[in-house]
Regions:
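Conserved AdoMet
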Residues: 7-8, 12-95
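Conserved S-adenosyl-L-methionine
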Residues: 98-100, 127
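Conserved SAM-binding loop of SAM-dependent methyltransferases across substrates and taxa
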Residues: 101-118
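Extended basic-aromatic, gly/pro-enriched interface segments that bind polyanionic ligands
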Residues: 122-200, 206, 210
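Conserved Class I S-adenosyl-L-methionine
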Residues: 141-172, 248-298
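A short His-aromatic
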Residues: 212-214, 244
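A short glycine-rich, Lys/Arg-flanked "PGG" loop and its adjoining helix->strand segment in the class I
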Residues: 220-232
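Conserved beta-strand signature within the Rossmann-like core of class I S-adenosyl-L-methionine
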Residues: 232-241
Length: 307
């Protein structure tokens, strides 16, 4: 079925309002019983895109704090590769937006400081919620229950990594001081046009997994605003965002996609891949045959001063 026809069908008001819910329930039941080899075919990808459009049209965006330590290992591997050539004892300016409970910023700092303990890493960790930021600042986590997060923060760590990152006391763990040191915690809104004045230019800006929870026009304005934080020639990590929107902004602002580990990073977080096409934050399968593959699926960009 041609993609354009599917797109027009998914936008039909009658289909959205009266048919979509039962239609999606039946399709989800059938989809989850298909062999992976069938789901990977082009006709099923196109049909999945049609289903995702329906899901997206019916979904209400909401703030979400669920995350994991070492959530996307290939992404962390690329961060390690980018900081490795830096001069001995040099300063690295890092800003992590929507840092949530701290899992991402601590994962990044553990990666950087394990590889380059000599670097002076000046870190800003930012979130819009003062409540979740307090959890992050404390760096103390329950192994049995987290009040704000439904899933286990530690499910992607092995025992060696748990020992390397945390000090344990019974049913709690605390992030090790050498990882935590020197972080500047700040309640702020990524949409604030004064953000660049507040934090200055950064060598690496991480803006992962929160733009998808905004309406698209709001997300686009926010992404353009975030780009102003990146030092010319620096790097922007941005995943968890509508792929068409990200590609549009990247082209408009002249970002250079980083090709290293492109597919590995795209597929590096199994939770969002598993959720496509049934959740609005789900991530479509990597398609190397697309002509725009290198920019559509890139989630790491070198940014220059066109923002």
């Amino acid at each position: 079925m041609p993609e354009s026809i599917l797109g027009r069908m998914s936008g039909a008001t009658v289909l959205r309002k009266w048919v979509a819910k039962p239609f999606l329930l039946v399709n989800e039941w059938a989809w989850k019983r298909l062999p992976p080899s069938i789901v990977a075919t082009r006709p099923l990808r196109l049909y999945g895109s049609f289903l995702y459009t329906l899901v997206d049209l019916r979904s209400e965006r909401r703030q979400y704090h669920g995350t994991f330590f070492l959530r996307n290992r290939p992404e962390l591997e690329l961060i390690r590769a980018l900081v490795t050539p830096r001069g001995n004892g040099s300063t690295l300016r890092l800003l992590v937006l929507a840092c949530s409970n701290g899992a991402e910023v601590y994962s990044i700092l553990w990666t950087i400081r394990s590889a380059r303990p000599d670097l002076n890493v000046v870190t800003h960790a930012v979130d819009i919620s003062d409540e979740i930021l307090e959890v992050a600042k404390e760096g103390l986590y329950s192994l049995t229950l987290n009040k704000l997060i439904d899933s286990s923060l530690f499910e992607r760590l092995n025992e060696e990594e748990m020992r390397a990152m945390f000090d344990r006391d019974k049913d709690q763990v605390k992030i090790k001081p050498w990882i935590k040191q020197g972080i500047n915690w700040q309640v702020a809104d990524a949409q604030d046009p004064g953000l660049a004045r507040l934090f200055g230019l950064q060598d690496i800006v991480v803006a992962n997994r929160f733009l998808c929870h905004m309406p698209r026009p709001e997300a686009e304005r926010c992404l353009r605003n975030i780009a102003k934080l990146v030092n010319p020639g620096g790097y922007l990590f941005v995943s968890g965002v509508d792929l068409d929107l990200r590609a549009k902004v990247a082209i408009d602002l002249g970002w250079k996609p980083v090709p290293d580990l492109l597919e590995e990073i795209h597929d590096g977080d199994p939770s969002v891949r598993r959720d496509w096409p049934w959740k609005y934050w789900g991530l479509e399968p990597f398609n190397s045959k697309r002509q725009d593959c290198s920019i559509r699926y890139a989630s790491v960009f070198q940014v220059f001063n066109k923002a």
